[in-house]
Amino acid sequence: MKADGVFAGGGVKGLAFAGALESTAKAGYDEWGKLAGTSAGAITAMALAVGYDAAGMKEVFETLDLDAIADYGPLGEVEIPVNLAEDHGMTRGQALLEWIEKLLASAPAPAETFGELEARFGPERLQVVGTDLAHTRMVVFPRDVHLYVDEHGHRLDPGEFRIADAVRISAGFPYFFPPRSLRDAETGKDGVLVDGGVVSAYPVFLFDTAEPRHPTWGYRLYSGNPPEKPPYTEIDGIAWPVDMLKAIVDTSMNAFDKFATLAFGPRTISIPTGDVESLDFSLSQEQKDELFDFGRDAAAGFFAGEPTGVNTFGAIPTAVSAAGSPGN
């Protein structure tokens, strides 16, 4: 059977997607149409888009050398202050880009640009979410590439944009990886492009239409309470300024996506990730295996319930309207 897939962000916790995809294939969904993702989810969506299957996905994540991705420089973590001052990131970000490029080049259906990918699989095969901090907007690659220009002032061609560059932007966790720059066509100023999770860690709505041809399954990672339970952050005591700042950041990044998870619950596979942190680059093999098992078990339980892929097109606008203040 065929389905579209959308994968949320989660840093190194994205290893759980490999297990979830194994159970998805066992449920009969072994062909993908359109794919989208943010951050770690962008890497997963990209790999599926260029032909890696469920078994291949496990190998993909096993090739990810987490220590190498944290490329501080020849002197290691001593170089962090210099990296931050010069490039606004703790690491150089080059190792992650090169790993992505290698995945694309060695894929069953290798592709360098979005145009090459769509020529083989059709339009909207892959959508990758990034954030332009300077212009305060979500950027969906390749759809929004035309918003930017090259050094000669010519608008960028979505079909010629490199997949690896888009995924590197989407996975560029702020401060840890340096942001990327693209010149905005309207303002003439450089955009500051970072992790798509800043605006939407779970863009499950990207492929929604009034009459979908097949279901869109969403894959979302969570730690702590399940997403259907209300979260709570204690903001009190001597550390309240830090607690409040963290709560502001978490709310700005996740409030809409938590709402979307409820709106799109019938087609969301929620995967617990235990106590693993998004930027924990020192995972043991036991932790990696545990993440895989979390994903496999969560997806197996989801499909055991015989989900129908309920079409929730328009659910968010309707719910937002209903939740408005009286008279709106």
Task: Give the ranges of each region predicted by the language model.
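Patatin-like phospholipase
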Residues: 1-38, 46-328
